[in-house]
Regions:
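Short boundary/loop segments of OB/S1/cold-shock single-stranded nucleic-acid-binding domains
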Residues: 1-7
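Ferredoxin-reductase
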Residues: 8-92
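Short, structured patches in soluble enzyme cores that scaffold and shape functional sites
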Residues: 35, 53, 77-79, 103-105, ...
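Hydrophobic N-terminal alpha-helices or hydrophobic patches in metabolic proteins across all domains
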Residues: 36, 61, 107, 195-197, ...
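Active-site catalytic pocket residues across diverse enzymes, especially alpha/beta-hydrolases
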Residues: 37, 136, 204-208
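Active-site beta-strand/loop microenvironment that shapes enzyme catalytic pockets
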Residues: 85-154, 186, 190
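Reductase modules of NAD(P)H-dependent flavoproteins
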Residues: 145-228
Length: 228
């Protein structure tokens, strides 16, 4: 990394150290990052951080799985078998590595006052869903459909027993949502592959959901590096 960029990065980005790496699902690793600069941040459930993964200009975005105000956050990073800088960083990050990352950001966040909460997405969405679900009290009304490649790809989500788990290749996610038929009046959080997100949004709109009550986040699309 060019030395001239370091002062700029110190102003724009936070610094932390990887303190734990754990295989969390068949294709996800959980990274714990700690540092004084991470203490006391304003973090909303569902937000994300941009991480430097190679050169000073190469960043990838990851949802925050868990945040501790004392100065620690956890990311769950998916190994998608690619060979780009983000995929390599996700596979190779190790305890002791320094990490530079931006402050948590994004508007795809929990609406805690909603009458009920509907979660629809795939593995890439389930990390943000995990933070949102963990922030909901036990009595919250929760439903949804989460798609994974195998049962071993399922994250340990709070309220998981109230979700319909869909194996990829069995029932298309939009069809699963149609079968679930969540009643309008709450908030729907829809994230994952871009075309699927759009299709699910149409299913909900056709079922009477107000567009303002359907929060969407296309995390990826085939053949594209990212949609941030």
């Amino acid at each position: 990394m060019p030395a001239l960029l370091n002062p700029v990065l110190n102003l724009l980005m936070l610094r932390g150290t990887v303190t734990s790496v754990e295989r969390f699902t068949a294709r996800m690793r959980r990274l714990r990052i700690e540092g004084d600069a991470l203490a006391g941040l304003d973090v909303l459930p569902g937000q994300q951080v941009r991480v430097l993964v190679g050169s000073a200009l190469t960043r990838r975005t990851y949802s925050v799985w868990r945040y501790e105000p004392s100065g620690a956050l956890e990311l769950c990073v998916l190994d998608h078998d690619g060979n780009g800088p983000g995929a390599r960083w996700a596979r190779e990050a190790a305890v002791g590595d320094e990490v530079r990352l931006g402050k948590p950001e994004g508007s795809f966040t929990l609406r805690p006052d909603a009458a009920h909460h509907v979660f629809v997405g795939d593995e890439t969405a389930s990390v943000a869903f995990g933070a949102m679900l963990a922030a909901l009290p036990d009595g919250s009304r929760v439903s949804g459909c989460v798609e994974t490649g195998t049962a071993d790809d399922r994250l340990p989500l709070a309220h998981a027993g109230r979700l319909d788990w869909v194996l990829r290749g069995t029932v298309p996610l939009p069809e699963a949502v149609g079968r679930l038929a969540p009643a309008p009046g709450g908030i729907a959080y829809v994230a994952g592959e871009a075309r699927t997100v759009q299709a699910v949004r149409h299913v909900l709109r056709d079922a009477g959901w107000d567009r303002r009550s359907v929060l969407t986040k296309p995390f990826w699309a085939p053949g594209k590096r990212g949609l941030e």
